Amino acid sequence: MAGRQPVAIVFDTFGTVVDWRSSLIAELTAFGRKRDINADWTALVDAWRAAYHPSMDRVRKGEQPWTTLDGLHRASLDKLVAEFGIKGLSETDLRHINLGWHRLNPWPDSVPGLTRLKRKFIIGPLSNGNVSLLLNMAKHAGIPWDMIFGSDLFGHFKPDPETYLGVAKLLDLEPGQVMMAAAHNNDLANARKQGLMTAFFARPSEYGPHQKRDYAADQAWDVVAKDIEDLATQLGA
């Protein structure tokens, strides 16, 4: 990449760094088999993710008090378990299932690419996940973050400006010294509005057969890469 380079690179996490869909489907399918609970776990995972943005929007609009993503995930799970007619789950079971979001697996290029980038840049997630979720995920997946920027540090979810600008403030950097990396064009558009640099790489299988967008960059982002390892190469890491 010619020209200016960032001091820090922050990454969207769900879908960008980790494969939430395949991870949860595999874990819940194994859980159901072990417990002899028959359910359409794939459909449940897709419905659970579909509840993600609407639940956060209720918080962002002030329709409900600040709630961590763990809390929002749990409220959505409770509703879906009832809707899917899944019986026999204890509170311990429900908590275990909800914490599946803490045990997501990385895409194959994520850890190698981040390890390279870490040698040259400050790296961390800028995610709607809470700090404990992202910390546990990093431990599970071996993700080598320098710092974890969870939504509960800011009391805001993306795309609120407080998230993007909050990273720069915490790192004592100007927004233009921070790069937002994501597999979602809308995330990058919101980051760019706040003055951040941007990097895009596609995750065309994030939503499985339900993927409808983000197959390619839809703007001239500062960097367009194949994946995180290619991002590292383009940034000279």
Residue ranges and their predicted role:
Residues 1-9, 111, 115, 126-237:
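Asp-based, Mg2+/Mn2+-dependent phosphohydrolase catalytic module
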Residues 14, 61-63, 97-99, 119, ...:
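A short, structure-level motif marking secondary-structure boundaries and short turns
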Residues 36-39, 85-88, 121, 125, ...:
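Secondary-structure boundary/capping signal
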Residues 49, 102, 115-118, 236:
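Alpha-helix boundary recognition
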Residues 107, 119-122, 196:
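Short phosphate-binding/catalytic loops that engage adenosine nucleotides
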Residues 31, 35, 113-121:
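A short, Lys/Arg-enriched amphipathic alpha-helix followed by its capping loop at the start of a domain
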Residues 65-66, 101-102, 123, 152-153, ...:
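A generic structural signal for short
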Residues 3-108:
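N-terminal helical cap/lid subdomain that shapes the substrate entry/recognition surface
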